[in-house]
Every structure is written in structure tokens, then in C-alpha cells.
């Protein structure tokens, strides 16, 4: 897409310094061997874009050779994902805790392992968009409901 594409759906940063920090952090970690930004060759220009008074970060996908690379398990406030190849039998132990996991597999035993894992907050089995919101999910619905436990209290007068 282009900077002036009316169909683009990226949110700008309220604080441009945050976009600068994220962009710099990704670039700094890309200096370490064992990682490649696979989306760079498809972009026209830099990851960080300043236009029409807004600061934006374009989607970024990196391929890491191992989980030892600092970008292999990072989260940023922008469209970012890392890809690390690992044997399926080692995957749950290697990935650690995750807010969202999408598994595109027909292996029913592996699906059962994923369902049983306490490390995964939200599990998508199949090609489900992570942009699809389900308000009945704890981290997508009312945050008050998620953060605070309801309980009834009675007090003697």
C-alpha cells in the first residue's frame, strides 16, 4: 500500500516519540545476526512514516533463526510478528506465555495440547483474523470485568 492509500487501516501514534522508540528498537535488534525483516523488501520506504501530521509504523514481520534472538519473542504497539521455526514437539515449551496463538494445523493431538496449555490466553484454531473481536473473551471485553472479581459482601450492623 502507499502512504496516501484511503483504504489503509493503520492507527497513528498519539505520541510520535513512542513510534520513534519502537522503530529504533526493532532496527537495533535487527543488527544482531540471525534475524531478517521479511517485510522490508515489500515496502516502499521506511517502516516509520510521518504524513499529514501523523506518525505511523508499517507492519513488520521478522524471521528469527532461533528463540535466542531478541526479536523472537517481543511485542510492540504496532503490527509486528516474529516467526521462528521449531519442531512441533518443542513448540509449547519454547514459545512461553502468549496472549494470542493461531494454529493452522489438522493434527488433533497437537490441537489438544494447545487447548490444554495454560500458557495461551486466546487460541485460534484455523485461519481466524486476530482483528476479529469476541467481546466474551477476557482480554477483549470489558476490562473492568476482567481485572476485578465480583463478589457479594454482607456486614452485620
Q: Can you say where each PLM-predicted feature lies in the sequence?
A:
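Structural alpha-beta junctions
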Residues: 1-2, 31-33, 117-124
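Flexible, acidic loop-helix segments that line cofactor/substrate-binding pockets
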Residues: 1-28, 38-52, 74-75
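Structured helix-beta-strand junction loops
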Residues: 28-33, 97-98
Amino acid at each position: 500500500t502507499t502512504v496516501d492509500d484511503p483504504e489503509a487501516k493503520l492507527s497513528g501514534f498519539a505520541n510520535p516519540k513512542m513510534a520513534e522508540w519502537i522503530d529504533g528498537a526493532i532496527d537495533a535488534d535487527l543488527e544482531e545476526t540471525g534475524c531478517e525483516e521479511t517485510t522490508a523488501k515489500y515496502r516502499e520506504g521506511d517502516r516509520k512514516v510521518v504524513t499529514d501530521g501523523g506518525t505511523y509504523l508499517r507492519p513488520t514481520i521478522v524471521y528469527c533463526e532461533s528463540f535466542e534472538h531478541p526479536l523472537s519473542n517481543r511485542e510492540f504497539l504496532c503490527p509486528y510478528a516474529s516467526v521462528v521455526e521449531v519442531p512441533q514437539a518443542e513448540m509449547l515449551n519454547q514459545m512461553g506465555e502468549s496472549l494470542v496463538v493461531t494454529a493452522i494445523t489438522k493434527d488433533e493431538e497437537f490441537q489438544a495440547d494447545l487447548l490444554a496449555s495454560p500458557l495461551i490466553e486466546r487460541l485460534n484454531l484455523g485461519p481466524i483474523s486476530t482483528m476479529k473481536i469476541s467481546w466474551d473473551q477476557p482480554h477483549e471485553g470489558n476490562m473492568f470485568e476482567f481485572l476485578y472479581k465480583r463478589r457479594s459482601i454482607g456486614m452485620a450492623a
